[in-house]
Every structure is written in structure tokens, then in C-alpha cells.
From Swiss-Prot:
Record has Hydrolase as a keyword: no
Cellular compartment(s): Nucleus
Transmembrane segments: none
Region ranges (Disordered): 15-69, 172-198
Composition-biased stretches (Low complexity): 176-186
Keyword entries, A-Z: Nucleus
Keyword Nucleus: yes
Segments of skewed composition (Basic and acidic residues): 37-49, 56-69
Comp. bias regions, Acidic residues: 187-198
Protein name: Uncharacterized protein C645.12c
Predominant localisation class: nucleus
GO CC terms in record: nucleus
Amino acid sequence: MSSARELLRKVKQERLGQKRGLKASSQELKRQKTRDHKSFENLGRDQSRELAVSDFNEKQSTEPPKDTRAVSALPENFFDESIAKNKELIEEEWNDFQNEIGIIEENAVEQEITLQQQQLLAEKDEENEIADNDLEPEVYDILYEEESKLGESRDLIRRLKQKRFETKKNNFSVKESSNLSNNDSDASLDEDTLLWGL
């Protein structure tokens, strides 16, 4: 599988011209420019012009003619689907390619959603700041009182839940410690339900 990937990568490089050195990354171009700039600073203007012209001439003379094409690294019958091995490799590569495209699309959608959410949050923050600036001191007092009441009610709810949990826990432990057998307790429950009409 890795050999098929390598072959497809080589074909892609040949198609894009990277194999022949026609394209270079932006970082490589920046590095080359800085190297050229530093080397030309030390030389006089006339010498730098002469060097630039000679470099240009050398590059043109070393480049292959545009009509010649690079020989493909793939075997001639690689895309022949009648060969089972080739067909499987092509299908695997195609599936991997589609999966990569799907992942890229998902990432793009996620980034777009997060960007929209950040913009909405920024807009809400701006609106809240504007609204907060327009409030009078009495309104701040009212908001503070409401906030403190909410905090007190939250504490009360938490304490009530804690007490309820403790009482349930105690009731459960009392039921476990009773001396009645299961049959006696079931019979007493039946009697109680009959008496109370439940």
C-alpha cells in the first residue's frame, strides 16, 4: 500500500512540476532571496549586476528544453484495472484520498462554525458593554441584590438536597437493620395496603 502511495505521489509531483524543480516553496524562495541579498551586499553594484546576469544565463542553460517530459516512475501497466493487484491499490488510494478530503471539509466546517460563534460572542460582549454603560447606579444595586438572592437560594436548595439525601440514607439503614424476615415484612405490607385501601 505504501508503494502505491509513493507511486501516486511521484506522479502528482511530475504533473505539478515539483520533480523537475520548476516550483519551489515560499520558504525556499525567501531563503534564497535573503542569501542572494546578503551575498550581493558585499559586492559593488557592477559586480552584482554581472553576477545576476551570469546566474540567469547559467539557469537557462541548465534547464531542460520545455518539450522534453520526464519519464514516469510508475510502471506502464499500473492503471490497468484488469490486473487485480493494481485495481486493489488504486481503490485503496482512492478511498484514502476521499477520506482525506472528508476530513479537510469537516475541519473547514468546524473552523467556520467556531469563527461564527466567536463573532457572535464578540457582538454580544459589545452589546452588553453598551448596555452596562447606560445603567444608573440604582440599577446596579438592584442587580446586585438579585444576584445575592440567587446565591442564597442556590445555597438553600443545596442544603435541602443534602438533608433529603441524609434522611433517605438513614431510612434505608433502618429498614436494613429491622429484625423482620422477608416473609413477615411482605405480609405486613399486604395488611397495611388492605387497611388503608391502597
